[in-house]
């Protein structure tokens, strides 16, 4: 471990001790908000304290085993214990390094999933539908809830565009690396010559704005249009202009919702999406500025970036952001078994973040 990382660990250990003292003070206990915030910070630092204590014990075990080597009768046993202690120390060093990676405060939150057909006409819309079902099935496996906010079905299946809210603990942390352009290579059902076509769809993963997020939307900046819904609700919604489209004039961001029966409910949902979109745009602007001075291989969230290819004839899926990340398990992945991909992407992100910490 580099001296820089070791100093960061020591500073966090000192902060945990300070928090322990603060949480015992009567004035802090009496202040519910402060007590809650400090308790949350203390809980986040607890794994580091536990790993540091384990490291101290492993170092003591190593020293004791090295001391045993002076006795010829115990040398063989000592060598075994030395090897075990060294292996344990190596594991703990890796664990501590990963614990230093800053946690994204949005990781536990919900998200908006947006899938749009790109180049490829009807085939692109069908592929967009495949991607949406893949994420919906993955969400179902995690016990999350998927609520379709708006959709525009393709003429021959799939979606020209579909927007859904994904509700579940840890949803954003799992899916946040999915933003970008997804490419498919396959023979369309309408292709009589058996030729492989290439189509694309874009995916956007936008964290839902927290209620405490500091963003003020001036009502004067909004243009609100109503229209007849073509979504859920049967004939009732088609008789009234219950659907809402909101345009944020300064940025040109447009959101709409037509899934609820009442105009008021649709407006509330649309405003939540607008807030999330504006916050996400600001985050991406800040990330772009920071990326000028540091490398971000995974997780930039750039929706123009081609991130993955789905090759149906070969049953292959290749993620272009991680060298060597190719899996020949396309049917299962499309059925919602995304963890083999997502875990590799998360690990790569941690490695990148750790490299930045070491450099700093």
UniProtKB/Swiss-Prot annotation:
Molecular functions per Gene Ontology: translation release factor activity, codon specific
Q: Could you list the residue ranges forming a coiled coil in this record?
A: none
Q: Which UniProt keywords apply?
A: Cytoplasm, Methylation, Protein biosynthesis
Q: Which residues carry this modification: N5-methylglutamine?
A: 235
- Does the record's keyword annotation contain Protein biosynthesis? yes
InterPro entries found in the cross-reference section: PCRF, Pep_chain_release_fac_I, Pep_chain_release_fac_I_sf, Prokaryotic/Mito_RF, RF-1
**What function does the entry list?**
Peptide chain release factor 1 directs the termination of translation in response to the peptide chain termination codons UAG and UAA.
Give the protein's recorded name.
Peptide chain release factor 1
Q: Which organism is it from?
A: Stenotrophomonas maltophilia (strain R551-3)
| The gene coding this protein | prfA
């Amino acid at each position: 471990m580099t001296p820089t990382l070791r100093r960061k660990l020591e500073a966090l250990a000192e902060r945990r001790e300070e928090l322990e003292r603060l949480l015992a003070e009567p004035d802090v206990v009496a202040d519910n908000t402060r007590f809650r915030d400090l308790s949350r910070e203390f809980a986040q630092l607890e794994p580091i304290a536990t790993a540091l204590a384990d490291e101290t014990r492993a170092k003591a075990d190593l020293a004791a085993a090295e001391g045993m080597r002076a006795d010829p009768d115990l040398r063989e046993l000592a060598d075994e214990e030395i090897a075990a202690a060294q292996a344990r120390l190596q594991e703990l060093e890796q664990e501590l390094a990963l614990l230093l990676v800053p946690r994204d405060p949005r990781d536990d939150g919900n998200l908006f999933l947006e899938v749009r057909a790109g180049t490829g006409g009807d085939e692109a819309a069908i592929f967009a539908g495949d991607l949406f079902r893949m994420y919906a099935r993955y969400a179902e496996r995690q016990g999350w809830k998927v609520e379709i906010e708006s959709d525009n079905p393709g003429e021959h299946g799939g979606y020209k565009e579909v927007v859904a809210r994904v509700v579940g603990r840890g949803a954003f942390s799992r899916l946040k690396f999915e933003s970008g352009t997804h490419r498919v290579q396959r023979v369309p059902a309408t292709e009589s010559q058996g030729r492989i076509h290439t189509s694309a769809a874009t995916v956007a993963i936008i964290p839902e704005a927290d209620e405490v997020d500091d963003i003020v939307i001036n009502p004067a900046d909004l243009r609100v249009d109503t229209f007849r819904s073509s979504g859920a609700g049967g004939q009732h919604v088609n008789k009234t202009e219950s659907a809402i489209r909101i345009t944020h004039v300064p940025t040109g961001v447009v959101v709409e919702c037509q899934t609820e029966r009442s105009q008021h409910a649709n407006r509330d949902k649309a405003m939540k999406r607008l807030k999330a979109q504006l916050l996400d745009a600001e985050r991406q602007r800040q990330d772009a500025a920071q990326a000028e001075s540091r490398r971000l291989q995974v997780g930039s969230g750039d929706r123009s970036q081609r991130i993955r290819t789905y090759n149906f004839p070969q049953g292959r899926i290749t993620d272009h952001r991680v060298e060597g990340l190719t899996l020949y398990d396309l049917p299962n992945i499309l059925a919602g078994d995304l963890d083999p991909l997502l875990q590799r992407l998360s690990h790569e992100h941690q490695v990148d973040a750790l490299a930045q910490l070491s450099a700093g």
